[in-house]
Amino acid sequence: MGRLCFAGIWLLSLAAALVCEKEDKRKTAFVMLAAFAAAAVASVLAGFAVLWADMGSLTAAVQWFSEGRTQHSAVAGSIAFVLTMHCLAGRERTERLAPLFLLLLAALRLSEAFCPPAGLGSELEGVPPAFSPLIREDAYGDPCLAVYRPEAAAALLCALTAAVQGRKGKPTLFPIACRLAAWQIFFENLLTSPLMLGFVRTEQILCLLILLAAAFPGTGMRKKPGAWGWIACIAAMGAVHGLLQFAMDKPYLIAEAAAHTDEGFDAAVAAVPVVCHILAALLSVVMGEIAARAGQRNAEGK
């Protein structure tokens, strides 16, 4: 069911691209098909490589790969899709199709409702499944946080922003990528990901590198000394985000310094993750806006 849903979304996006692109529809169709093919190949290769490296057995990797357990391959597929579009379509065509790509991303996220989702958070004890639209049962019937739903909402919001900015003639691809990357750092806090580097998830580091690359002034567009202020600000907030991640994973260490009684200690342990999640969400929005402004100035050549 999930694979059929993915295939339907790809076909609908291709049809939408042909409708939106008024000139040179043949080249648009070729570029879209090439990007889809590159994404599929990269997704398969990356997923198989990750399984082989984790299991250490070629037979086990083939068995698990045939069952479709290749969640981390989505990252490689997305990168291949974007790079192919950038190389073949050119900047202007990619800018025009940016809202469509964001709608495609939102649709792919929402399609996880019909398959084992990659964007499912940890189990929530004592919470009924119907308590919130952000709650979904996993394969064992336990209520979990459906992180893919706010991720889809973020993509829809970015699609609306890209459509409005595109009509004003402003570059949209870099700013939207910055906002999505910054917000994804927060969404990764809510996921149960086994890929860890210390207490920070590797996906968060990848998103931070995207932000730094967008603000990097070494492309020749921006060589003013003030350009490095963007990078320093983003890197500093990334470090703070890492500390918040540590506080969410190890709340009892913070609670020991805040309370000495049993009741106070329990209350502090419960409060620390909530406060850190709120701070992380606000910090993600600020990081996204700062990086978006830097990326837009780079795109405009200022």
Could you describe each region identified by the protein language model?
Residues 1-302:
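Hydrophobic, membrane-interfacing alpha helices
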